[in-house]
């Protein structure tokens, strides 16, 4: 009995994984610093041109991710329907709702939205701010970043209940001066049968 096909398959998966990891890391280190640098300049001078440039850089960043999906994961099967009568454009303002099934949801929305509508921002956890470049880009690009508080924390400090709402309003006000797509996972967390029951 030969194990050659299994070794070849395992080697192919490892090579693909290394390729994806290398390209994503390289793209992050290429696109992340300019987004951060432009974001810092906004502290001193507000400018729609800075926002537009940051969006272009971010779309390029997402374009690299989409290239990976198309070329490194070519056997991927999509089962997605987009209403042909839906009139989307890059200058629009959209509110999108979605059931949060897995970490792939955001990738799929970014993949299909990249050339159809403005950059999709979504409500995200504050803890992601600590991911180098990515977390800071979320903040700079106007992604509403929510802190999760337990019932006990809110009971001790009732002001915490309204803090996320104020952060969401602030992020949404920042988006008003530009085209945007705001994605909200209404249940606020990934779906599991346990949470559903």
Enumerate the predicted regions with their spans:
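Soluble catalytic domains of membrane acyltransferases
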Residues: 72-197
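Membrane-anchoring hydrophobic helices of lipid-metabolizing enzymes
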Residues: 2-95, 108
């Amino acid at each position: 009995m030969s194990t050659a096909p299994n070794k070849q398959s395992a080697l192919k998966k490892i090579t693909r994984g290394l390729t994806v990891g290398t390209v994503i890391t390289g793209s992050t280190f290429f696109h992340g610093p300019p987004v951060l640098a432009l974001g810092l300049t906004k502290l001193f001078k507000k400018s729609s041109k800075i926002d537009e440039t940051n969006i272009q850089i971010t779309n390029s960043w997402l374009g690299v991710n989409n290239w990976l999906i198309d070329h490194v994961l070519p056997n991927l099967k999509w089962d997605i329907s987009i209403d042909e009568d839906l009139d989307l454009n890059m200058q629009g303002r959209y509110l999108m709702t979605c059931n949060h099934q897995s970490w792939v949801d955001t990738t799929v929305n970014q993949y299909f939205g990249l050339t159809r509508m403005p950059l999709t921002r979504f409500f995200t956890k504050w803890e992601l701010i600590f991911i180098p470049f990515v977390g800071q880009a979320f903040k700079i690009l106007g992604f509403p970043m929510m802190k999760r508080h337990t019932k006990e924390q809110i009971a001790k400090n009732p002001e915490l209940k309204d803090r996320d709402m104020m952060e969401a309003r602030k992020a949404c006000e920042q988006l008003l001066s530009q085209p945007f797509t705001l994605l909200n996972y209404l249940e606020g967390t990934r779906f599991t049968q346990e949470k559903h029951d």
